[in-house]
Amino acid sequence: MARSLKKGPFIDDHLLKKVDEMNEKGEKKVFKTWSRRSTIFPQMIGHTIAVYDGRKHIPVYITEDMVGHKLGEFAPTRTYRGHADKSERSTGLK
C-alpha cells in the first residue's frame, strides 16, 4: 500500500541535512547511511550514497529516474546463488 498523499514523502532529517550541506559546498563525496526507508528527493541527484544492506554499505549513484523511490530498493539484502544443480543423488533415488 502506498503512503498517503496528505502525509507527503518521508526522508530522515539527518540525511536531508547532509545532502543540503553538500549541495551548498558543491561537494560530491560518498557518505554512508543506514536509512533504507528514506525517499529519494531531487536534491540528491548526482550524489553517491552508501546504503547499508545488513552486512556492508553498497554505493548507489542517484539519477533522475530514481526520484520517488526508496534508497533500500537499490541495495538488495539477499544474495541469490541459484538453484541446486542436478546431482546423482537427486536423480538416482526412486
Swiss-Prot record:
InterPro entries named among the record's database cross-references: Ribosomal_uS19, Ribosomal_uS19_bac-type, Ribosomal_uS19_CS, Ribosomal_uS19_SF
Annotated PROSITE patterns: RIBOSOMAL_S19
GO BP term, pick one: translation
UniProtKB keywords: Ribonucleoprotein, Ribosomal protein, RNA-binding, rRNA-binding
Gene3D superfamilies: 30s Ribosomal Protein S19, Chain A
Pfam families membership: Ribosomal_S19
GO cellular component terms listed in the entry, alphabetical order: cytoplasm; small ribosomal subunit
One Gene Ontology term of the molecular function aspect: rRNA binding
Chain segments annotated as coiled-coil in the UniProt record: none
NCBIfam families: rpsS_bact
Family statement drawn from the similarity comment of this UniProt entry: Belongs to the universal ribosomal protein uS19 family.
Job description of the protein: Protein S19 forms a complex with S13 that binds strongly to the 16S ribosomal RNA.
Annotated protein name in UniProt: Small ribosomal subunit protein uS19
Gene: rpsS
